Every structure is written in C-alpha cells, then in structure tokens.
Amino acid sequence: MSQSVSESTRVNPDGVVVERRLTREGVHPFDEVEWEIRDAIIGDPAKPAFEQRGVEFPRTWSQNATNIVSQKYFRGQLGSPERENSVKQMIGRVAGTIANWGREGGYFASDADADIFEAELTATLLHQEVAFNSPVWFNVGFEETPQCSACFILSVEDTM
C-alpha cells in the first residue's frame, strides 16, 4: 500500500490538511508570473517625496501599487543592503513567517501540508486575490512579536 507524502510525514494527526488550489507541486508561485524592474517615485520626479529605483514587481501590478508597496511595506533602511527591493522578499517574509508559526505550533497535519499552505498563501498574495492590512506588512517577519491588527475596540460606556 502506497502512502501519500502527507501520510508518510505526519506531524499532527489532528492537524490541518491543505490541498493545492492555485499552485503546482514543484513549481514556486514566483516562477509562474512575469517580473519587471521598475522605479518607485512619489511626487515630482525632479524633487520626489519618495524614490526607490530598481524594484522588482510582477508585470501585472500597477505603478500605483509599486509606489505604495515600495514606500510603505518594503522593510529596511532606504539605501541600505538590508532594504527589501522585491515583492518576492516582502511576500516571502510574510507568508514564510506565518507558515512557520503554523509549523512551530503543530497546526498542520504534515510538513507537506505546511509547505502547500505557504505556497497557496504566497500565490493569493502575489495575484492580489487577498491582502493583509498594513500592520501585517509592516511587522510580520520583521518584529519578534509583531502587532498584526490595525483596529482596537475600546469599551464605550452606554448611557442610553
């Protein structure tokens, strides 16, 4: 009797089993899209409010998305070697961190399920089918204990 990869590398028999929907085994989601190098410039090109040249984005992403992502969500000091300059780095940082939290927490049925989850999350982010709120992009994979929510509900006294 043959076993699937998920069955042969069981981590948690009660864990989440993940099926591929958007990705193919052995093919990274980043290899499925066409990439281009662009410049992110906000404001007057002669005196920009923000500028990062040579950033890598999927061809399908707009220039507006390029400008916003480069300015707001790429991590690292602008001009430093640590500065992110590709959507691959940004999505990889976030999707990889979230998948690793699941691995460390024993959420997945197998290592293969964790890998599929990471690939599927990467694909949905890459194709802009889903998007996290800003604190996720700012902090996940960068801060040890990141703040991932943008809204806080405070108790309000009801005097009616």
Q: What are the roles of these predicted feature ranges?
A:
Residues 1-160:
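Extended catalytic cores of very large enzyme megasubunits
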